[in-house]
From Swiss-Prot:
This is Inactive serine protease 54. It holds the Pfam family Trypsin. Its main location: secreted. It is found in: Secreted. The gene is Prss54. Glycans are attached at N113. GO terms for cellular component: extracellular region. Belongs to the peptidase S1 family. Plasma kallikrein subfamily. The keyword Disulfide bond applies. Gene3D superfamilies: Trypsin-like serine proteases. Residues 29-258 form the Peptidase S1 domain. Keywords: Disulfide bond, Glycoprotein, Secreted, Serine protease homolog, Signal. It comes from the Eukaryota.
Length: 382
């Protein structure tokens, strides 16, 4: 009965939110490939941030249809950048990789170019990112958890420098290395950074480029979270790694996206509920990386450039395998030329004026679903 109650609580919460499923990938990470190569459906949230000449600047991770997280250091004084998605295999013979223009770059207001403190930035795409097997968002944790979340299966992904290119990244097949957090770190650590080390001592793959994402799974769940962005990687392979802790910046991410729109939220509202459920090996993967289309009055110049798609979670075989899958429709690319908005470190967004309007009210169909679950609760006596 408690198990049924837990499932219904999760479905109730999901039914009233326009939430997008995040942290789900089609590939099974335990399928080891040669030379730590990433398969085409692994890490579908990793993107390449490039300039207009298609020079790779840094990696980023998709958080939602419109938001990508990356490093501030790689985006200084950049006016025109794009995000190339579905990059697990960047075979030059395959020229059909989708790219999205960035119309807002939001570096952390306290980013220090000398110490590299607060080296984090948000990027907003000009049009909604289309999700499929090769392109998906990843979750991020909230900092306000009462206890650390149990994680497993942590990896750093990136492109390996070759002898032919020196320190420059060659866009090819994405690689990955397994890492673990270490508490006693001999490296000098900035605030809001953590230390990790390679788990495979025989690895000769070096992926220590700043900005490379570190990703882990929440234990007992098939749910991937963005743990951090590399701040420092040793030249020795294997070696030590420093990474910027994303959950330490969750409040910043939420505040900035709420101000610029559409807003994001971390998955910590799910944590206490999900981890207390009596499922020992459950596969429930639920998240709240969401935004409400109805809670923002968009400026005309921006709304013309966006075709906001209605998101609705697609539940598939919930009662059989306890997994919730999501699907989102893509927004059409903008036909209106929109100049990117840029944020200075201290002044915020130029031309601010977004007003919050209306109530975050349930759609009629969602209200009916919510009422149905309430009736199930009452009828079952749980």
């Amino acid at each position: 009965m408690a198990e049924l109650r837990g499932i219904l609580l999760l479905l109730l919460y999901m039914s009233h939110s326009s939430s997008a499923i995040c942290g789900i990938q089609k590939a099974n990470i335990v399928d080891q490939l040669h030379e730590n190569l990433v398969s085409s459906t692994e890490f579908p949230w990793v993107v390449s941030i490039q300039d207009k000449q298609y020079t790779h600047l840094a990696f980023g991770c998709i958080l939602s249809e419109f938001w990508i997280l990356s490093t501030a250091s790689a985006l200084q004084n950049r006016k025109e950048v794009i995000a190339v998605v579905g990059i697990a295999n960047m075979d030059p013979r395959n020229a059909d990789h989708k790219e999205y223009s960035i119309n807002a770059i939001i570096p952390h207001e306290n980013f220090n170019n000398n110490s590299m403190r607060n080296n984090i930035a948000l990027l907003r795409t000009d049009s909604a990112i289309h999700f499929d097997d090769l392109v998906q968002p990843i979750c991020f944790l909230g900092k306000s958890l009462h206890k650390p979340t149990a994680l497993k299966n942590c990896w750093v992904a990136g492109w390996n420098p070759t002898s032919a290119t020196g320190n420059h990244m060659t866009m090819s097949i994405l690689r990955r290395i397994s890492v673990n957090d270490i508490e006693v770190c001999p490296l000098h650590r900035q605030q809001k950074t953590e230390c990790a080390s390679h788990t495979n001592k025989d690895s000769n793959v070096c992926l220590g480029e700043p900005g490379n994402p570190m990703m882990c799974q929440v234990k007992k769940l098939d749910l991937w979270i963005l743990r951090g962005l590399l701040a420092y990687g040793s030249d020795l392979c294997p070696g030590l790694l420093l990474y910027t802790s994303v959950d330490d910046y969750s409040n910043w991410i939420i505040a900035k996206t709420r101000k610029a729109g559409p807003p994001l939220s971390s998955i910590h509202p799910w944590e206490k509920l999900v981890l207390e459920l009596p499922f020992h090996q459950s596969n429930i993967a639920l998240t709240k990386n969401s935004y409400s289309v109805h809670s923002y009055a968009w400026p005309q110049s921006y709304s013309q450039g966006l075709r906001m798609s209605t998101m609705y979670d697609k539940q598939k075989d919930v009662w059989q395998n306890l997994r919730v899958n999501g699907q989102q429709e893509a927004g059409r690319p903008s036909n209106v030329a929109i100049q990117p908005m840029y944020y200075d470190y201290y002044g915020g967004e130029a031309g601010e004026g977004r007003a919050v309007a209306g109530q975050n009210r349930l759609h009629w169909s969602q209200e009916r679903i919510l009422m149905s679950f309430v009736l199930v609760f009452l009828g079952s006596g749980v």
